[in-house]
From Swiss-Prot:
Pfam families: Methyltransf_3 (PF01596). The keyword Phosphoprotein does not apply. It comes from the Bacteria. This is Putative O-methyltransferase MAP_2558. The keyword rRNA-binding does not apply. Belongs to the class I-like SAM-binding methyltransferase superfamily. Cation-dependent O-methyltransferase family. PROSITE patterns: SAM_OMT_I (PS51682). S-adenosyl-L-methionine binds at residues 49, 71, 73-74, 79, 97-98, 147. It comes from Mycolicibacterium paratuberculosis (strain ATCC BAA-968 / K-10). InterPro entries: Cation-dep_OMT, SAM-dependent_MTases_sf, SAM_O-MeTrfase. It is an enzyme of class 2 (transferase). One of its GO terms (biological process) is methylation. One of its GO terms (molecular function) is O-methyltransferase activity.
């Protein structure tokens, strides 16, 4: 036997893939602080990473060294809490969002988790403008979870921010499968494909696409 799991009779490949993702999501439990932050995100209509994506973010952050992390798209702080859980005790999370209410709720989530103000830097404004002010080759990990239309711009800036050995992580890299549908050609799909192309063609990066959440494209910089 080759060790490959056989499909059950009548079980199609897509349903098996969906079962694997569902199992991955069910394997991660969130504490009360994360649950409260997630509930606030739902209340205001802010997107939030799934628990499995959050666990992956924590893992990648820890593997990267986790001292300087940049996040594009704060939301209500769910992803920020996961990132902080993988960071060193003296690490600083820089997180950017254009919505003041999102930043307020994220600040609340961080405070409830006992994370001191010296460990987070919340910046309001357009990410395209804020990112240009951040230091070159300084960050261990850059997480992009914002409007897919702007992914190419964020990828260019995000790679610039990465130190050698750093990791860039792009959420919504599959758009629920639309990015892989040859017939899909709307503006979001075109932008997401362009972001993926930029990463794939950058010889400094080693990428992988992970089918969790809305698709995670991660790449480490040489």
């Amino acid at each position: 036997m080759d060790g490959t799991d056989a499909e059950a009779p009548g079980q199609t490949a897509p349903s098996r893939a969906e079962s694997l993702v569902a199992h991955a999501e069910a394997s991660i439990s969130e504490d009360a602080l994360l649950a409260a932050a997630r509930e606030r995100a739902v209340d205001i209509g802010a997107g939030a990473v799934t628990p499995a994506v959050g666990a992956l973010l924590s893992l990648l952050t820890k593997l990267s060294g986790g001292k300087a992390i940049a996040e594009v798209g704060t939301g209500a702080g769910v992803s920020g809490l996961w990132l902080l859980s993988g960071m060193s005790d003296d690490g600083v999370l820089t997180t950017i969002d254009i919505e003041p209410e999102y930043l307020r709720l994220a600040k609340q989530a961080f405070a409830e988790a006992g994370i001191g103000p010296s460990r987070t830097r919340l910046i309001g404004g357009r990410a395209q403008e804020v990112l240009t002010r951040l230091a070159d080759e300084y960050y261990d990990l850059v997480f992009i979870d914002a409007d897919p239309i702007d992914q190419p711009d964020y990828v260019v800036e995000g790679v610039r921010l990465l130190r050698p050995g750093g990791v860039i992580v792009v959420h919504r890299a599959a758009l629920g499968g639309r990015a892989g549908d040859p017939a899909a050609r709307d503006a979001e799909v075109v932008a997401v494909r362009e972001a993926a192309r930029l990463i794939a063609e950058d010889e400094r990066l080693t990428p992988a696409l992970v089918p969790l959440g809305d698709g995670i494209l991660a790449a480490v910089r040489d």
